[in-house]
Structures are given as structure tokens and as C-alpha cells.
Amino acid sequence: MILKSFLLGNLLSLCMKIINSVVVVGLYYGFLTTFSIGPSYLFLLRARVMEEGTEKEVSATTGFITGQLMIFISIYYAPLHLAMGRPYTITVLGLPYLLFHFFWKNHKHFFDYGSTNLNSMRNFSIQSIFLNNFIFQLLNHFVLPSSTLIRLVNISMFRCNNKTLFVISSFVGWLIGHILFMKWVGLILFWIQRNRSIRSNPLIRSNKYLVSELRNFLSRMVNIFLFITCVYYLGRIPSPILTKKLKETSETEEGEENEDETNVEIEKFSEAKETKQEQKGSFAEEDSSLGSEEREDPNKLYGKKRKGYQENWKFEILKDKDLFWFEKPIVTLLFDYKRWDRPLRYIKNDRFANAVRNEMSQYFFHKCPVDGKQKISFTYPPSLSIFFEMIEKHLSLCTTEKLSPEDLYNHWVYTNEKKRCNLNNEFINRIEALNKGSLSMHVLEKRTRLYNDKNEQECLPRMYDPFLNGPYRGTIKKVYSHSILDASTTSTEDSLRVVWINKIDDILPTNYQEFEEKMDPFNGESLSTDINHSLASTSELAGESPMDFRFNLKEGLVLPAEQKQRRFDSENPMKYLKFLFDAITTDTPNYKTIQTKSIGIEEIGKKVPRWSYKLTNDLQQQERENEEESTEDHAIRSRKSKRVVIYTDNDKNPNTPISTNGNQAEEVALIRYSQQSDFRRDLIKGSRRAQRRKTVTWEIFQANVHSPLFLDRIDKTFFFSFDISGTINLAFRNWTEKGSEFKTSNSDEKETKEKEKKREDKKEENERIAIAETWDTIIFAQAIRGIMLVTQSILRKYIVLPSLIIAKNLVRMLLFQFPEWYEDLKEWNREMHVKCTYNGVQLSETEFPKDWLTDGIQIKILFPFCLKPWHRSKLRPHHRDPMKKKGKKDNFCFLTVWGMETELPFGSSRKRPSFFEPILKELEKKIRKAKKKYFLVLSVLKEWFRKVSKEKTRWIRKIVLFIKKIIKEFAKVNSILLFGRKKVYESNENKKDSITIISNKILSEPTIRIRSMDWTNYSLTEKKMKDLADRTTTIRNQIERITKEKRTIFLTPDRNGSPNETSCDDKRSESQKHIWQISKRRSAWFIRKWRYFIKIFSERIYIDIFLCAINIPRVNAQLFFESTKKILDKYIYNDQRKKEGIDETNPNKLISISKKYFSNISNKKSRIYWDLSSLSQAYLFYKLSQTQVINKYRLKSVLQYRDLFLRDRIRDYLGTRGIFDSKFKKLPNSGMGEWKNWLRGHYQYNLSQTRWSRLVSKKWRDRVNQHRTIQNKDYKRDSYEKDQFIHYEKQNDSVVNSLPSQKEKFQKHYRYDLFSYKYINYGVNYGDSKDSYRSPLQVNEDRGIPYNYNTPKSESVFVLGGIALSDYLEEKYIIDRGKSRDKKYLEWKILNFCLRKNIDIEAWTNINKNTKIGTNDYQIIDKKNPFYLTTYQEINPLNPKSFFFGRMGMNQGMLYRPIANLEPWFFSEFVPLYDAYKIKPWIIPIKLLLFNFEGNETISENKNINGNKKGELPISSNQKDYLELENRNQEEKEEFGQGNLGSDTQNQQKDVEKDYAKSDIKKRGKKRQSKSNKGAELQFFLKRYLLFQLRWDDPLNQRMMNNVKVYCLLLRLINPREIAISSIQRGEMRLDVMLIQKDLTLTELIKRGILIIEPVRLSIKWDGQFIMYQTIGISLVHKNKHQTNRRYREKRYVDENYFDGSIAQHGKMLVNRAENDYDLLVPENILSPRRRRELRILISFNSGNRNVVDRNLVFFNGNNVKNFGQFLDEDKHIDTDINKFIQFKLFLWPNYRLEDLACINRYWFDTNNGSRFSMLRIHMYPPRFGIG
């Protein structure tokens, strides 16, 4: 068994080895390549099928295999691969051969196949077959381009070591596959030859020449395929002929450009002390040095001719123009090797105008040391690797053998340990020095600063100091080359400068061509930092052998005699590198001056190669034309556009002096852009297009190309997406709640109609655009269309219409009517054919648009002539005026190509009013009149006949009745016995007769009446209905009477004498009948209503059984509510009497809710159904948490004994929240681990107010301290304000909606998410005054009212507040977009501008208005934070008309991120204001930001302010004039004047006075102000609001464009009055948009709503800091460290400069003041922050325990941390005791900090900065503390 398993294991391992071996992989790959069938197989199969002899077959196969072998060799041999992979290979070799072969084969008599000896190998045809197969195999990328196979090769080559074996095996694999394929083809051909069924086919047998025809057909097919291949390759190759040669930047231009740039740099970097001469020396020839600025590119660097010092320049490549044509290589003759061959975009830098050369890949693989191991970095700087290769070739430094990985790793560990020891020792020494009593200033580690001037000891500005500013780490300015020296310079002083030439010159090799392939010129200075850290210890590479490097002076370098040759030891490689790169030496004092002057700091950036072209686009070209520069055509493609001249000013102004271009007329032109999808924008002209596969465009205007694979991911149009759930909900709602059915249907109908209309309009517009674009794209279409339009216009005006007028008037004369020549000709003259541009801008009747044949034209017909059969006389009354006006509005049209009229260009043709329609109408009228007369006569006659007939019938009836009477009298004489039965019978008969007569009479009369009425003009249907109703009632009455009479007659048998009595049997039968009838009726009714019965029954069962379960907790809830209601009411009543603060009109929200609720519940007869099932516990406690701090002991019993409703956890939760006291008040540790407890203690994370304010969903203190709760009545959406359990109003028959809509669900989830967020962040939001974080600006120590109890929504996570952001963002998680009065909005529409001219903006932002109302707490006013600018305006809920203040107070909009990313050099004077707004954009009051602020001089008098004033601020009642300047001053007085400034009013006042001293502006009168406003407004607007985009609303834009179109026409007319009036009547020209007032101010424009200032669009992107602080916000629950509600301020006892302001903040920590045990100095602050971090990281690395080879080196052993965790476990609530806490903090200081957990900067550990993705390899720390 053991043996078997052993053998089996061996077999498996053997199999795995074989499968993974290079040979097998190669064979597999080779076999796959067989299926890459291309055009090369055409010739091979042709040779086989045509049967031209074995020699040809053999030569074809040999050529084919040789070609494939070449391809496989090219995989291994790089030069061959490069040669074949170039696009020019196809151009130079492939295409000419293809074309030659194609034309040769197509010409039959060009070569004769059979002329030479077949057996000769020299036969040209056999050689050609070989060549065909060989070359075509090389070009085999056709049917399957086999990109997958190429990738496979790359992967396999990367993996396997033995590359030769891989290539051979893959070739063998291909050969096997190829042989199999050819055998398969041979079998198929053999089968065709031998198949009897094919041969027995009569068609084949009868055709003798079938074989020869087949051969001809095959050769023809091969030629067709060959042609297709040629065409295909033509698309792929770069064309050598048709490329657009681009103009290179001339030397002079470049020189000028460089001069400009150097001037900029002088301004930026040089100090004021430097003289002009030194500047010249420092910055003159930057281009000449190798490692120059960003703008340096290979072509400029090596392509520019250097004058006078070519012999010194090692990389010199002469410019092409300096060589003769025969000296240039062939390829550069054919192709411009510096141009764009792929569709590259032109990336332009603002400072350096030439385009970036982006051929280079962003990935560059190279090995680099990472964590002591050599790893492959794929973002390694290529320049660095090239540089290392150069150094290796030139120096003996790196020639020794390299160290093993273990040695390297150990060395790395050793250096880290050494660093740690050094840091530890230094740290301990500093602490010991402190203990000995040294001054702290001497002990603290000082930051190294760069001096600007040693004598004056001025440091560099912080921005440019590399030691202070990370991103701005410095590079030292260039060393200077010979170009600085004049030829005549001989003095030694000048010659000393020559030392500073680029010392790297000498070590670079002279044979530059070796590096040409991967040349990427590097910038020595910028790379110095990279080299310093990448070559961490050059000794690792160089070994320990000492290196003797001699620096030879060449080419006229002068060195002072006293300076000796330098030696470099391997122990100090960095010194060597520094000497290489930096122009710094310490030997001679003479050099120091040069060195200090040449220091300049630059931001590190990626140095990119640039093209030598300076390209322009269309717009820049036009700008240059305006500047009268002669330039070539623009080289960058813009969007397809056409320039349309709309106005040419030919008037010469006599006052203006005659200039050179005075003859040229001034043109006003618009640019018309094509509406097609534009994928060529910003491409360089002549560049090849990318061959897109699997991409389609299916819309008229499509911004991006889409792949059909991802169609399901795209938001589809209406037709593809249909909201099924919405329709189902709609149906169910209508089914269950019938009452609201009609209302909803009406509103829905309206909405659907509007939507339909919009859709139709959109559809029509798209169709029009499509037609316009088709005309635009077809060649010569515009010319054809233009000519046709002009022809149609002439035909219409001068042929068709005059002939119609003549014909009409002739017919009138024939019909003996007056002709209307004058009227018709007047109307015909009025018709104007105005020539318009393609977009419809009107020009004039005679003037054609410029280039109208190419650009297109429209012809607009004003007052289009309409032929009428007659004209109305003017004397007729105008009773149809309104209709006429309606028709007159669209009194113009556009002419179509077919001579029709259309409303809009390219729209559908409109129906013209018919000529014959009024004639026919008139005829109809006359016929109707004649009919009326005729029918009137007829009806009179009929009436007369009817009357006569009536009389006759009456007379006959009377005679008949009289005769019957006589007969009756005779019958009475006879005896009863004899004639009894007969009498009854006769009477019955008579009755019958009489009935029939009566009924006939009744029936006949109405029919006659109806018939007679038919002829009149009454409404026939109404009459018929009436008559039918009368008829039915009369018939019913008759029938009833007859049945009664019959009953009385028939029920008179002998046994019952009296006719009025009935027998018992009859009664019984009658009652049975009656019951039967009732039951029948009832059953029918029951069958009809069965459906509803079942439904009601099921509903009853549902309500009785299922809702019973829901009602059980409701009882408890009711009891709970009643008890809380009593307690709360009592408490509030008491509280109101104690305190004045709470407003009587608005009691607490929860209480008002509960009052409403119980008042409704108590009303038994109320039909409202209260669905308390939606009242969740979470919601209830949310509401409770918003109440004022209630009397907790009263609630205690309720909250303890309602066990069904309240659980222990919730009771504890409420206890911790401070709503009531639990017996054992626990601290809420539910959401936190022990590490968070620890984290709480670190003052570094007691974040600044700004940071916290981003997390906290505050209602910015507007109303809390005024103790008001405003009911939000207007807020109609589903927010927290809408109390769920009130708004459930249902009818009796309705049930709980079984299909809640998606929206409701969404909102429900949203609300609970919000609640859970608040639960986690409750310390931030709602905690009581003792335990919770409170901003120092808003602490109420005495009263325990949480400052934001009136918080309907949290705005810090899901709802983006501020400017109603729904306009700018996707509607993702933003539901509550209705404007709540609690929200602050930035309303840009109604803002005014600050019009002060000369105000210091710092002072403007520095105005501190932190005056709180109603509190006695100290307010911090920090000089360094000028941003706590808050205004206090009460929003009066009883005055909804107060528009300005009613829009949410409007004073603090909430935004969560900076508005834009402007660089500081944009407007320098705007920087402080913008920065302030960027940091805290929601705090600056808008009124202060944008309105005129007149400094209030009286504020200094308000020093003794009564603190007991009411907290409500009055609003100026005159709301209409709130934008007027005078009222603003008054309002601001009120805002400043009222309120309690607390006990430190005077201190605060000083701050305020100080700030106001700067911006103290006296009041001006309105007149003076309005004068100065005009200039100041514009200036102010330009300076401050360019970061906002201006836009007007779309309707206004459209109206403006319409006006412009009319102006264009009016300008050209001699007498424009008539057209102007008519265009105003038509509504084409709008007067409200015209600028009639010339002095209309910006303020007015904004007030009118014409101009809207919008912020630049925001993106939904949380920045990293925000997320980080969110995380901290969750963990830091106890933030009472921030509460500074003592009446004192702790002194800052440490200098801020050395402690980064961190201890200053810490100094405010709440400590027991009785003991002077303030927070001790945290020892880590001795070190600088950078060294601090380094020490912490070194300590936590524990690098000794790592494995070197196999493991991923990112994890480490965390044993050394356990002792801290044990310490933590002892006391979970360590922060409750301050002294303990301080000790705890001191104990833990250096080890574990949040930034160490997340972002270890690998900068100190010699990691190459290029490997950006090493962030993925962050050290994953194990959990510090044993959680759980």
C-alpha cells in the first residue's frame, strides 16, 4: 500500500512537472497559434487546390513555415520584434508588395505560367509563391488579430527561464497543428474528388469545363480577398504622403517663451535682495543645462542648435534642417518621426505651451528595494534606471558583485534598528536634560530652516522651505554651463563661475546612440530626492571595496589652484551623489555667495517629454488673427463649427483716426456648432484614428461611444424602462380607496398630458436636428439645398403668387363681383423673404449670409401671403378679435425645399389655409338658411293638418261612445239570471276595447308629437328622451290600473257575494307570490354583489384577527402616552412659570403630538383610523431624545414597569442619554472597543471646532438659546418632522396598504439609517449637558436643554444641506429636498453685492459676531479663527410672508466641502476670503459676505448689556425693502445690539472693536452710494465671483436669442418700425429682456432674477479627511474636554511654534481647578513631528521577527503590545478620573496612534517612491486589545 501510494504520489508530481514544463506550455501555445488563420493561408490553399504541381506546393509550404519561424524568432529576438512591430514595416514592406501582387495577378498576360521549365527551382513563379507565403505569414494579423495569443506569449516569456526552449517548443507545436490542418484540408479535397454523388450530378457531368472554371473562380476569389486585405491594411498604416506636416516652434519664439518663463520664475523664487545682474546669472540660460525645467523635451534638448559650445555638449544631435537631404536616414525622409501617428490628445500646460508627449507608458518595470528586499516596481522612474545604467558603465562604483537577498534584508533591519537606537538615545538624553532643569527651549528639537541671507538671518518663506513643507520639497537651482561666459571673459573672478557647470557631463557616456531607444531625459535636480532614497546605501550594491573617483577637468573648466582633487569613499556614497547633483560646496567662501543666490525651491513634479510643436486650436487661431499675427491653420481639431457673420458694420466713423485696417468692415459673427457626436475633438490634425471595435452610436447626439455589451448598464429611454411597481400601486390605490380615485385621475391625466406633450416636442426637436445634421454631412448638400431654396423663393414670390392673384380676380369678374387687385397686391407686397443663417438668424431681404453655399441658408417668410376669396370690409364690427390675435402671433414661417411652409427650420410642413374653404362655408350657410325656411313652412302645414285630424277623431269618438251608451241602456232591461255571465263577459270585452282604444290613443299621440317636433330646430335627442320617459310612465300607470280592475272583476265568484272580500286561499297564494318575488329579487342582488361580499368578509377577518396582535401593545402605548402626557404637561407648566425662555405659543413638539393624538383617540365617534403599528420604539425614543430634559423621577415608574413596551437595554440607553436616571447608570460602551476608550484621551483628537462642525448636524445656534420650537407646518415631505402616527387617515372600508411603494420603503430605511447614525453619534448630537460634547460657543451650563433638540434631520451624512444641492447632484440619497425652515440655504438669487471699494478683506472676514443670547457662558473669540461669524435672526413662524428671513434664515448655508479648487495665484486679494469660505463655507453669514456692510460705530457703547433680555430678535417689518441699503444698516444694528454678551462682555468687546477698527466705514447717503456703486459693482463682481459660474435661466436665454435674431434684421432695414411693432405683437421680441435702462445695476439684474449666480458644481465625493474624522467621531463619545464653560481661560503655557498648537488646545482641557494638576507635558512633543512619527513607527515595526524569503513581509508579530492591552483591561472607564487619565496618556504616548494604524509613510525606510501601490502593503497591525 505504501509503495502504491508512493508511486501514485510520484506519478502525480511527475505529471504536474510535465504539465508545467516549458516544452508543454510552448507546444500548447504553438498549437493555439495554428488557429490564427489569416490571409497567408489564401496562397497556401490556392497552391493546394489549383494543383499546379508539387514544386509549387512544396515552395508554398516552405515559405509558410519559414514565415512562421521568423515570427517565433521575433518573440525571442528583440530587434527583429521591434522591426516587425513598427507600423512603418507594413507601410514600407507590406503594402507595396500587396498592391504589386494584386495588380500582377489581375493582369492575365503579364506573366506566362507555362513558358519556363517546370523542374527548375529558378522558376520565377515558384520563387514568387515562396515569397508570397513568407511575407504574408509575417503580416498574419487579419481574421483573428490574436491579441490574446500575444498576451499569452508575454506571460509565458515572463514566467519561464529557458526562453529558447519555449520558442522552439512553441514552433514545434505550431508545426504539428499546421500539419494536422493541411491533412484535414487534403482529406476534404480527396472526399470531393471521390464522392460519387457529386460526380453523378447531371449538371457537373454535362459541364466539361467545370474544373477549369472552378480554378478560375478560385483564383478570382483569392484576388478579391487580396484586394480586401489591401484596403484593410491601408486603414491601418500611417500614410507617408497624406500626413499633415506641423510647423515646429521657431527658435526665436522659443527663446521669447523661455524668457517669459524665466521672468516668472525670477518673480517667484528670487529674493528682493538680489541684483538684476545676479538674476541674469542665475536664470539666463536654463535651457542649456541637461536637467532643465518641466518644459524640456527631447526634441528641444537635442534638436536645438547650441551656438558656440557644441564641442562641450555630449548629447548634441543636429537639427534636420542643418543636414543635407542625402545625410538624413530614409525613414525620416519619408516620415516625420516627431509627429502624432496615433490620435493623441494635445495636453497643454498653462505655463509651458508645447504639448506633452504622451507616447511613454505610465508603467516602467524595474527592481527597487522595498522593505529590504529587491522587488519589481512597475512605476519606477525610467530616467532613474537609465541613469543607473550609465553610472554602472562609467564608474567602478557598482561593478562588484551584488549582495544576496538575505544580506540586503539583514542590512535593512540593521539600519532600522540603528536608527531606532539613535532616536531613543537622543530622546532619553533630552528628557534627562529636562530633569536636570535645563530650559525647555534648549531641550526641544528645533526645526531646521533654510536661511535666505546668512547675515540678516532671514528664513525662506514657509511655502518654499523644503524642511517645512512636504510637497514643496526643494530642488536646488541649475548649475551653469559655458553659455554664461562671454568669449572675452578672462578675469579670475568671472572664471570662478565656470566651476558651476553641470558636473554630471563627464560621467555620461559619449556614445549616446546606445540609449536612444529608451531615452527619457531626466532632470537631475528633481531626481535628487529619488536617488537619495532609492540608492539608500550604495554600499549595498558596491560592496565594501573603496572607490577612488577622480574628477578630471576637461574642456576649459577652470579650477582654483588650491582646490585639490576630491576623493570619494564607499562609506559616504551620498556625498558623492550630492556632489554630482548639487551646486553646493563648502571649500571656498567665494562660492558660497553664488550658492546662496542660486537656491530656488520648486515643486516636485513628473518631468514629461514634450513635442517641439506649438499647436493652436480654432479659438486661439481666431484670437491671433484679431491680434494681426500671421499664423498657419490651426492644428488641433475643434468641434465641427461654422462661423456665421450676422452683422457687418460698414459705417466709417469720421472721428476715429484712419488706421491700417480701416478699409476692413467690422463683423459680428456667431459660431454654429454641429449637433453630431464628436469623437475627434482635440485630436491633432493628420493623426491616425483608433480602430474601435464593438462600439456603436445609436443616438443623434451621443457624448460617449458605448459598447453593446453594456447596454443593460446604461440608463435607457422611456420605452425601455417601465415602472411596473408604480402602476401596480396606482391600481391598488384606486381599488381600495375609491374616494380619492377621481382626484388622482384628474391630476394624473394632466401630468400625463404634459409629459406626452413634452415628449412629442422633444421628439420633433430631435427629428429636426437629425434632418439638419443630414444636410450638413452630405457633400454639396448645402449648396443644392441653398439653390433650391432661393429658386423656390423666387418662384413663390414672382410666379406662383402673382398668377394666383390674377386667376382669382378674373374668376371674380366672371362671377360679376368686384375684383380685389389693390388688397391682394398690398398683401403680396407685404410678404418679405428674409435670408437667414443656417441657425435662423435673420439678415435681410437682399443680403445673403457669408459662404451660404457651404454653410447653408434658411429663408424666412415674414407676413406670408395667403390667397383669400374675398376681403372683409373694414366697417364690419370686430367681434372675432381675440381669435385674430391668436392667429397673428405666428405670422411668419420658413420656406422648405419643396416650396412648403414650416414653423421652424427643418420642421414638418404646416397646413396652409384653403382658398375654397370659406367659399364652401358660405355655401353651406346659404343652404342651411334655405332649408330652415322650407322646413318652417312644412312644420306650419303639418301643425294645421294635425289639428284638423284631431278634431275629426274627437268627433268620431264621441259618436261611438254615444252609440255604446244606448246599447248599455238596452242591456240593463234584461234579467240578471239570464244574462249574468254574458254581461260580465260583454263588459270585459268592452273594457278590453276601451283599453285598446285608450292605449292606442296614448301611444299614438306622443308619436305624432315627436314626429312633428322632428322638423324643428330643437335639440332632437333631448326631446326624444323626454317623450320616451313620459310614454313609459303613462303606460306603467295604465297597466297598473287595468290589473286592479281585472282583479276586482275576476274575483267575484258565487260563494263570495261582496266583491271587496277575498278568501283565505287567495291571501295565502298572494303572500307566497310576494315572498317568491322578494326572494327572487334578493338572490339576483346577492349574485351581483357576491364579489364585494367576499372581499368585505376577508377584510373583516384580517382586521379582527391579525390587527388584534398589533393592538395589544397599542393599549400599553396608550397608557404610557397618557401618563407621559400628564407628567410632561405638569412639568412644562411648572417650567414655564420658573423660566421665561420657553415660548407659550409653541410647546414642545412631542407634547403637542401626544395632545393631538389623545384628543383624537378620546373622540369615540371619530372615523379616523389611527395606525399605531407604525409607531416604532426607535421613533418614540428619537422624539423623547429631542425633548427638553424632563423631570426624570416622575417618568421612572412608567419606564420601569411597562415591560412589554420598554426593555432593559432601552431603559439603560435612555439612562445614559440623561432622559431619566437609572439605578446603575452605565456608560455607553456598546458601540466601542477598548481602543476607543483609550483614543478618547488623546487631545490630538479633540478636534478643532471646524472639524467637529463638519460632523455634527447642528442647527447653527439660531434658535436653541432663544428657547423656541417652531412647528414646521409647510414641510410636506416624509421627513422626521412629519410625525408618522398622525397622518394615517383611512376610510372604513380601507385596510393597511398591502403594497407600500418603493419610495416609502426607501424613506423608511433612510429614517432608520439616520436614527442609527444619530444613535452612534449621540454624544455629538444629543447628550445631556454633563456628559456630551458641547461646542464652546454654545454651552448652557445652568439649563440642561440640549442645544439641538429641534433637529429634524442630520445633515452630516446623507442629506447634503446648504444650497439646495438637488440641483447640482444626483438624487441618490437625498429625499428631504423640501425647504425646511430649520435649514439654512445659500440663496444666490436674491443676494446683493458688497460694494465697498477699498476694504481690507481680512478685516471683512475678521468680524467676530459671536455674541450669544441668553447664556452666561464665556465665548471664545480667537484671533486666529476669524470664521465664527454667526448672525441671529429669529424666523417668525406667524409671518410666512417674510420672504427673506422665511427662507430658512438663509444665513448659514451648509456645505461639506470646498466649492472649487482654485490655485492661490488666481486672484491674490481674494485668497484670504476664499480660503476662509473654503474651510468653513457654511459659517460666513451670507448677508455679511455679499451685502453692503456699514460698520456700526455705536457698538463700542454697548458695554453694559443687560443679560436678561428676551432671546427673540425683532425682524424689520418692512420686508419689501429688505434689499435696500439703508435697511441693512438698521438690521445689523439690531443684530449686534441685542443679546447678552455674558460676563466677559468687555473683553469680547475689545476684540470686536479691534476688528471693527479696520472696517470702520461711515454711512453714506443713498445718492452718493448709487453713483459709486456702478464701477464698484463690476469690479467687485469680477474680483470675487469668478469662481462662481454665471448663468441665466433657459427661458431667458431663449428670449434673448430671439431678440438678437430680430435685432439682426432691424439693423439692416431702412424703416424698421413696422417690423419691430409686428415682432413685438407676435411675441418674437420681448421688451422685458431689452436693456431699456442703461444704468441697470447688477443688483437689479439679480433682484429681477435675470442673472443667477450659481456656485461651481459640486461632486458627491467625501474627502479622505472627512471620512477619517467621521471614524474618530464615532469613537470619541466623551468630548467634555471641549467644554470650556468655566469663567476663565487657561493660559497657554507652551510656545505654539514648537508644539504645533496642539498643546494650546490641550490646555483648555477641563481639569479640577482647585488642584494645580494641569495636564503634564507629553514627552513626545520634545521631538519634531517628523521624528516623532519616525520613532513611533520604528518602535512598532518589530522588524527582527520577520521572515526573509517566503512570507509576505507585511505582517509582524505583535507580542510586544500585549502589556498595554492588559493595562487597558483593568479599567474600562479610565477617562472618568482625570488624574488617572493623564497618567494613562503619558504611559501610552508614543506607540499607537490613528495615523500609524492607517498610513505608515514608508519614506524613512528607503522605499522607492515610484511604487505607489505599496500602500496596499501597509503593515496590518493585529488587534491591540483583546476585544470580547
Swiss-Prot record:
Entry keyword Metal-binding: no
Keyword annotations from UniProtKB, A to Z: Chloroplast, Membrane, Plastid, Plastid inner membrane, Protein transport, Transmembrane, Transmembrane helix, Transport
Gene Ontology CC: chloroplast inner membrane
Pfam families (alphabetical): Ycf1
Location of this chain's protein in the cell: Plastid, Chloroplast inner membrane
Residue stretches spanning the membrane: 18-38, 64-84, 87-107, 124-144, 172-192, 222-242
Regions of compositional bias (Basic and acidic residues) in chain numbering: 270-279, 1550-1562
GO biological process: protein transport
Stretches for region Disordered: 270-301, 618-637, 741-763, 1533-1571
Top-level taxon: Eukaryota
UniProt membrane topology term: Multi-pass membrane protein
Main location: plastid
Task of the protein: Involved in protein precursor import into chloroplasts. May be part of an intermediate translocation complex acting as a protein-conducting channel at the inner envelope.
Record PANTHER family: PROTEIN TIC 214, PROTEIN TIC 214-RELATED
Family from the record: Belongs to the TIC214 family.
Subunit (UniProt): Part of the Tic complex.
Protein name (database record): Protein TIC 214
Organism field: Calycanthus floridus var. glaucus
Lineage: Eukaryota, Viridiplantae, Streptophyta, Embryophyta, Tracheophyta
